[in-house]
Amino acid sequence: MSAATDIVDAAVDAALVLAAEGTWRDISLRQIAEKAQIPLVDLFARASGKNALLDRLSARLDAAALATAATPSEDVHDRLFDAAMARIEAMEPHRSALTSIYLGRAALSLAPRFPRTARAILEAAGVDATSPRLIAMTAVWVRCAQVWRDDTGALNRTMAEIDLRLKQMRERLGKMGAGF
């Protein structure tokens, strides 16, 4: 791992701590650098704003979904479910911070990250991310992330939502001739 990667990852970790403790919109890059004990000039050279840190965080969380690619299962639904749940489980320890980030930003500014996550879930499941599938999986992911934010306890509501939405996605894509 390079020094640049270490700096950005340390800043992401610090940003998560600060977001869990406060309001995301009120947190500055300077505060993140201070919390991470990184000179602001070094952080700024590698991540010039909080969006860059959110991109790195999203990539780290997507890696959890991609790690399920080695999970053997004949059923595509099960592979998609496992990948989506791996992403959710990676998010779970950071629930307070992620909720602060979501509430502290316009939801639309987070939207560009959703297709990347959808692609990671599809690819982890061995499903070619064609345009219709990517659009459908993005819609599934957005809804499931909303349910997760409101879910408490053992994630039963989240798991049920993922299961339902994946079944609906498969059925609708099949009707369009874009199924898997």
Regions found by a protein language model. Give the residues of each.
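N-terminal intrinsically disordered/low-complexity leader segments
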Residues: 1-6, 179-180
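Helix-turn-helix
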Residues: 4, 10, 14, 18-56
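Solvent-exposed, amphipathic alpha-helical segments
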Residues: 10, 14-22, 64-68, 140-151
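Amphipathic alpha-helical interaction segments
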Residues: 10, 31, 82, 86, ...
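Alpha-helical DNA-contacting segments of helix-turn-helix folds
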Residues: 19, 47, 51-64, 98-101, ...
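Hydrophobic alpha-helical connector segments
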Residues: 67-104, 113
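Amphipathic alpha-helical packing segments from all-alpha helical-bundle domains
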Residues: 105-142, 160-161, 166
